[in-house]
Amino acid sequence: MLDDRAKLLLKALVERYIADGQPVGSRTLSKASGLELSPATIRNVMSDLEDLGLIVSPHTSAGRIPTARGYRLFVDTMLTVRQEQFAAHVLAPDQPQKVISNAANLLSSLSQFVGVVIAPRRSSVFRHIEFLRLSERRLLVIIVSPEGDVQNRVIFTETDYSQAQLIEAANYLNSHYVGLAIEQVRERLKNEVESLRSEIASLMQAAVAVSSEAMSETQDEVVISGERNLLAVTDFSNDMGHLRRAFDLFEQKAQLMRLLDIAGQAEGVRIFIGGESQVVPFEDLSIVSAPYEVDGQVVGTLGVIGPTRMAYDRMIQIVDITSKLVSNALSYHK
């Protein structure tokens, strides 16, 4: 348990190191903390903090820098998020993929690190369906999901349907089955098939099959923006190993997907410092993330990836604001 003096010194050390990236010595810490303590007293406190694994002394300097554990204590107990006024940013309502791409770019631009967004999870529920006759026994099925995604599929049928029959079938599906999962629609059709004209029942069963196929093909997608920003970060540009691990993460995406999925299970902004997530075991990377919603339902996650030496107060606000912008844009478009 740290006393108030040790907490103040740790807070001052972390803030100073985030600001200039240089190991912090006792003289600098004395000025930064505003405490009237002798250099010897400060050195003793720093030694205690080092014993607790909160700071460490690089081999090339007499100063100290925070460890991942030190950053975690700082974020959990000492961080004050100031209401910084960003320039007015708006994500216009649009197709989901466009909103997601714009959000990743916005995160990258505001943070000057890497912006990541998991695209909305496609629902197995349809909002609207239409049929268009292309030629004899050849139809276009248009499926609209609750998230606004549009899937088009061409199907071949045994019967040559007229456009009037196609409209009748679509109207029946849209009036009776909207909001139900595809599997629920399939089961209900089995029970209702006797009350429907056989040719219409066959068409709707084919439509349900192709809808299920279309929706099962869609998978979560990670949109990444600003990877090159890390080239300008001293923490990475001075160590090619750090940079290589980061770019491997962006290229493979599987680890990143798992981490953002975990983050999306919590409310509000979540911070992973260094390797504490155990999914992305890189001590030199931190991720600030938050879920976003459509009509109150979480459909994806977004965040900022950067060095552990980042301005967490600013990143929290950037991520929080962007998640709200994405939620509003997707809900409005819907």
UniProtKB/Swiss-Prot annotation:
It comes from the Bacteria. Coiled coil: none annotated. Keywords: Repressor, Stress response, Transcription, Transcription regulation. Pfam families: HrcA (PF01628), HrcA_DNA-bdg (PF03444). GO terms for molecular function: DNA binding. GO terms for biological process: negative regulation of DNA-templated transcription. InterPro entries: GAF-like_dom_sf, HrcA, HrcA_C, WH-like_DNA-bd_sf, WH_DNA-bd_sf, WHTH_HrcA_DNA-bd, WHTH_transcript_rep_HrcA_IDD. NCBIfam families: hrcA (TIGR00331). Negative regulator of class I heat shock genes (grpE-dnaK-dnaJ and groELS operons). Prevents heat-shock induction of these operons. Belongs to the HrcA family. This is Heat-inducible transcription repressor HrcA. The lineage of its organism: Bacteria, Pseudomonadati, Pseudomonadota, Betaproteobacteria, Burkholderiales.
